[in-house]
From Swiss-Prot:
It comes from Homo sapiens (Human). One of its GO terms (cellular component) is keratin filament. This is Keratin-associated protein 10-12. In the hair cortex, hair keratin intermediate filaments are embedded in an interfilamentous matrix, consisting of hair keratin-associated proteins (KRTAP), which are essential for the formation of a rigid and resistant hair shaft through their extensive disulfide bond cross-linking with abundant cysteine residues of hair keratins. The matrix proteins include the high-sulfur and high-glycine-tyrosine keratins. Sequence repeats lie at residues 36-40, 41-45, 62-66, 84-88, 94-98, 104-108, 109-113, 114-118, 119-123, 124-128, 131-135, 141-145, 151-155, 156-160, 161-165, 173-177, 183-187, 188-192, 214-218.
Length: 245
């Protein structure tokens, strides 16, 4: 049996590929190039790339039929019940368990930012950080991190590891973060510059210099036994000599 052509824009109706034998006369569209029928769960609607708008939000069979083949279309995300996301093939764990759907995130029903290959990343659109903190994507990263509001951008659920991105002079955020303790814990010197966006120890003691005697945690990163440290690069290294220490 013939099917509709790919050009589906015919007034206010949608022509979908299908056999006329399976549809009633009321769903036939006369102005199509060939005879075709609309699915029984869809009402006449503008063409949405082979996606017809469900009749009602409570019509779960309609959502399953129209949304599952292409769950990322705008027709599904705007008209379907939450079952559209829950039944999605992108990442069910992201669409089903994430508490960010209504609270502070944009609809992430199978958008490209939602269905990451490794882990799901909710898209936050408000100042509140409760979305990422309560997310089930990576609890260790999103729940325990104190950086959401204070000095870091939301970094919930990065594919490999959560790296806080700090802005400002305070390093307390990353020091207490559970994302990367080895990277963000303090060294023997405090950061002398906030040029680097990555919170990492920017001070290292000079070679063959005892740490207790030559690297004192002062705000200026000045060793107790020598001159001011050279802070031209991202790593602030004490410049005291071996004899001075």
């Amino acid at each position: 049996m013939s099917v509709c052509s790919s050009d589906l824009s015919y007034g206010s109706r949608v022509c979908l590929p299908g056999s006329c034998d399976s549809c009633s006369d009321s769903w036939q569209v006369d102005d199509c190039p060939e005879s075709c029928c609309e699915p029984p769960c869809c009402a006449p609607a503008p063409c949405l790339s082979l996606v017809c708008t469900p009749v009602s939000r409570v019509s779960s069979p309609c959502c399953r039929v129209t949304c599952e083949p292409s769950p990322c279309q705008s027709g599904c995300t705007s008209s379907c019940t939450p079952s559209c996301c829950q039944q999605s093939s992108c990442q069910p764990a992201c669409c089903t368990s994430s508490p960010c759907q209504q609270a502070c995130c944009v609809p992430v029903c199978c958008k490209t930012v939602c269905c990451k290959p490794v882990c799901c990343m909710p898209v936050c659109c408000g100042p509140s950080s409760s979305c990422c903190q309560q997310s089930s994507c990576q609890p260790a990263c999103c729940i325990s991190s104190p950086c959401q509001q204070s000095c870091c951008v939301p970094v919930c659920c990065k594919p490999i590891c959560c790296v806080p991105v700090c802005s400002g002079a305070s390093s307390l955020c990353c020091q207490q973060s559970s994302c990367q303790p080895a990277c963000c814990t303090t060294s023997c010197c405090r950061p002398s510059s906030s040029v680097s966006l990555l919170c990492r120890p920017v001070c290292r003691p000079a070679r063959r210099v005892p740490v207790p005697s030559c690297c004192v945690p002062t705000s200026s990163c000045q060793p107790s036994c020598g001159r001011l440290a050279s802070c031209g690069s991202l790593l602030c290294r004490p410049t005291c000599s071996r004899l001075a220490c």
